[in-house]
Amino acid sequence: MRVEETLPPLVDTPGDLAEALREGTLTNIPKSLHEHINTAYPAHVCLIGTALPDGCAQITPRGSTMVFDDEHFALWERGRGSTNANLADGTKVTVFFRKPPLRESGLLPRGGIARFYGTAKIYKSGPIYEEIWKRLIEPEKKGDPEKKGFGVLIKVERAEDLSGTPLAI
């Protein structure tokens, strides 16, 4: 059984998807980066950025960050700390990925860096919650053995390199 067959659509209505496509707001995570991001732990974990209530940036490494599909990152939030306190449906999130060998190989420019900007949606139960847990790497599962955390999907709205140029890979 494919995941797409069991999960609800990630947009509210087909009209929302058509509108998003017309407006050009959907941004894909380049397929050439999927495996690099999904195997980033432990050497090249993604940094996740959110804004604190005082406006300062909260940046934290998340070994649980993974590509969920072409348009979404997923991560497991263990339920403690200031990032957890600031994550809610609609929270703006930055995913910062850096792997210098990708610059050397020519896959990514400027330091092997890709930045993704999007919006979070929280899952505390249901099929997406379970799918995120299922895909989670074992070291992260060990950090939450009682499964008290929650899943987060981040819908990518923009992807760029270090200079702010849209990713073109």
Question: Can you say where each PLM-predicted feature lies in the sequence?
Answer:
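Binding-site signature for planar aromatic cofactors or substrates
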Residues: M1-I169
